[in-house]
Amino acid sequence: MKHNLQDNLQGEQMANTNSNGGKKPFSDAKIIERANLLRDNDLYFFFRAIEETEASTVTVKGKKQIMIGSNNYLGLTHHPAVKEAAIKAVEKYGTGCTGSRFLNGNLNIHEELDEKLAAYLGHEKAIVFSTGMQANLGALSAICGPKDLMLFDSENHASIIDASRLSLGTTFKYKHNDMASLEELLESNMSRFNRVIIVADGVFSMTGDILRLPEVVKLAKKYGAYVYVDDAHGLGVMGPQGRGTMAHFDVTKDVDFNMGTFSKSFASIGGVISGSKDAIDYVRHSARSFMFSASMPPAAVATVSACIDVVQNDETILNNLWSNVEFMRNGFKELGFFTYGSQTPIIPLFIGDDMKALKMTKWLESKGVFCTPVLPPAVPKGETLIRTSYMASHNREDLSTVLEVFAEAKKIFDIPNHLH
């Protein structure tokens, strides 16, 4: 049954018309109602099957598209040295580890990667998890106990929100990148808890803005709090040789825990937590998502190691990335798009209206541009955007084409130049 998309896109609850023998059917769930509305109107842009990938293009439904929705910032998924390392690892170790690192799934290359990442990030120790999500879930739920407090930015990643729910500690949000809001919570709560941990993204995934990390560090020192940075979108991109947001601000020694993922710049899957020797040893023996999950597959481990080598030895990769970012940022500015002041490879484009964003995404796809609409609740109501992101492997011809297509789209869909 088709419903009115405009009236129901925000997720109003539909009536339950199927008793299903007394069991409430999942088809009546609000999220399924919304998904069906999008499907009915041919505006469902989730789970798009990508049939082939190249340096910065993908094939969907037999049609090649310029990919500007990927987190493959360094463009290393097709780098010859990276692919060769993955293949050699499979030949030596097989396709999987079939066990937890805690027991039978700990390969020597896992430990070598731990050490390599610790040196790369500038911390005493590091430990590799199977995914970035598991790294946050495991580490945060381990270090925030019943007598502890977690203070986190209101725009943090979902994994931090879920970790706060898993932890036995108390959790409070502070306003996004608002140091006055953070200090108010620190001042009123420090004496009530054993440990206080400030948790924030290094680069925020939707708007691409950067954590005011030096100010966070200053407040942490003033009040005696720990600092935990989720640098999923900063690792490999920010700072010298892509060492991350804490290196970008030269505050590595002041960050107690640094988390990174390998599913973005490092062309693989997995996550890492780095910090002091004692802190990481504690996480190693306490993080349930680490202890009770099978370890990273050998090919994934070798891929990450090779990516670190590439970014450390070939400065043209980061130079190309930032050149492309500057080109697109200036291009969108000239076209009159509001980009939230982003200074990273994530360049969000304010659209405002949900329907307009969905229809524009469909139109862009028809013109050979793959991008991602971001709707509430991922962003505040009325601030729907199209999230674009850029890679070192993009060529200038494709990026110029993207700008030409967006120039036409802005006129067709009457996109505003600023937030309402």
Curated annotation (Swiss-Prot):
Name the GO cellular-component terms: cytoplasm; plasma membrane
The pathway noted for it is:
Lipid metabolism; sphingolipid metabolism
Q: Which organism is it from?
A: Bacteriovorax stolpii
Protein's name in the database:
Serine palmitoyltransferase
- Coiled-coil stretches, from where to where? none
Q: Which UniProt keywords apply?
A: Acyltransferase, Cell inner membrane, Cell membrane, Cytoplasm, Lipid metabolism, Membrane, Pyridoxal phosphate, Transferase
Give residues annotated as binding pyridoxal 5'-phosphate. Answer: G132, M133, H233, T261, S263
Q: Name one Pfam family in it.
A: Aminotran_1_2
- Annotated InterPro entries: Aminotrans_II_pyridoxalP_BS, Aminotransferase_I/II_large, AON_synthase_class-II, PyrdxlP-dep_Trfase, PyrdxlP-dep_Trfase_major, PyrdxlP-dep_Trfase_small
